[in-house]
């Protein structure tokens, strides 16, 4: 069992029950999945760029990503229907907790000029999104072997009903919110 999973079961869940007064243990918010998405618009011109992005995301997530394809053609972006435009990976269970642990304790402190993450990026239904500007903050990515700096979007999906509950859950997981 992952370290954060044990902390959730032993400390965070009972703390949230006290804080919000839940009557059933199934009401306690928990993490459902973490989705990592990397949009690679440059892949339209060069196929090797997509291979490098897939390799980077595989190292970060520890799981092979799915290549996402364009649903319809957009002439302004020079995209045809079915063309590879990004990659994504969904983490659940132990892998999700392991990634969250590495992200909060190792990757976030490596961000340049880091002052905490925004507490306003909740979607109104208890899910949180964070954008990472460069993939080199993850220790799995070797700085010398990176062909280009690419950002990625990290979506954290919870069972929380409100943003307040989700923020309490993520704060208990030691998320460094600045406001």
UniProtKB/Swiss-Prot annotation:
Domain of life where this protein originates: Bacteria
Xref: PANTHER family: 60S RIBOSOMAL PROTEIN L11-RELATED
Organism per entry: Acidovorax ebreus (strain TPSY)
Family membership: Belongs to the universal ribosomal protein uL5 family.
NCBIfam families assigned to the protein according to its UniProt record, in alphabetical order: PRK00010.1 (NF000585)
Pfam families: Ribosomal_L5, Ribosomal_L5_C
Family annotation (InterPro entries): Ribosomal_uL5, Ribosomal_uL5_bac-type, Ribosomal_uL5_C, Ribosomal_uL5_CS, Ribosomal_uL5_dom_sf, Ribosomal_uL5_N
Function: This is one of the proteins that bind and probably mediate the attachment of the 5S RNA into the large ribosomal subunit, where it forms part of the central protuberance. In the 70S ribosome it contacts protein S13 of the 30S subunit (bridge B1b), connecting the 2 subunits; this bridge is implicated in subunit movement. Contacts the P site tRNA; the 5S rRNA and some of its associated proteins might help stabilize positioning of ribosome-bound tRNAs.
Gene3D superfamilies xrefs: 3.30.1440.10
GO cellular component entries: ribonucleoprotein complex; ribosome
HAMAP family found in the cross-reference section: Ribosomal_uL5_B
Name of the protein: Large ribosomal subunit protein uL5
A Gene Ontology biological process term: translation
Protein keywords: Ribonucleoprotein, Ribosomal protein, RNA-binding, rRNA-binding, tRNA-binding
Description of how the protein assembles with itself and partners: Part of the 50S ribosomal subunit; part of the 5S rRNA/L5/L18/L25 subcomplex. Contacts the 5S rRNA and the P site tRNA. Forms a bridge to the 30S subunit in the 70S ribosome.
MF terms (GO), sorted A to Z: rRNA binding; structural constituent of ribosome; tRNA binding
């Amino acid at each position: 069992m992952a370290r954060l999973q044990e902390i959730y079961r032993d400390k965070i869940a009972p703390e949230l029950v006290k804080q919000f007064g839940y009557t059933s243990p199934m009401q306690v918010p928990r993490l459902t999945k973490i989705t990592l998405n990397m949009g690679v618009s440059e892949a339209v011109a060069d196929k090797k760029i997509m291979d490098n992005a897939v390799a980077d995301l595989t190292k970060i997530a520890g799981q092979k990503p799915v290549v996402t394809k364009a649903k319809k053609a957009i002439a302004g972006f020079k995209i045809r229907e079915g063309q590879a435009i990004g990659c994504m990976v969904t983490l659940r269970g132990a892998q999700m907790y392991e990634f969250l642990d590495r992200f909060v304790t190792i990757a976030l402190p490596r961000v340049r000029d880091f002052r905490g993450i925004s507490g306003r990026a909740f979607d109104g239904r208890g899910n949180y999104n964070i954008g990472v500007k460069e993939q080199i903050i993850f220790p799995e990515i070797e700085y010398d072997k990176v062909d280009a700096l690419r950002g990625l979007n990290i979506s954290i999906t919870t069972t929380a009903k409100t943003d307040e509950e989700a923020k309490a859950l993520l704060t208990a997981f030691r998320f460094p919110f600045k406001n």
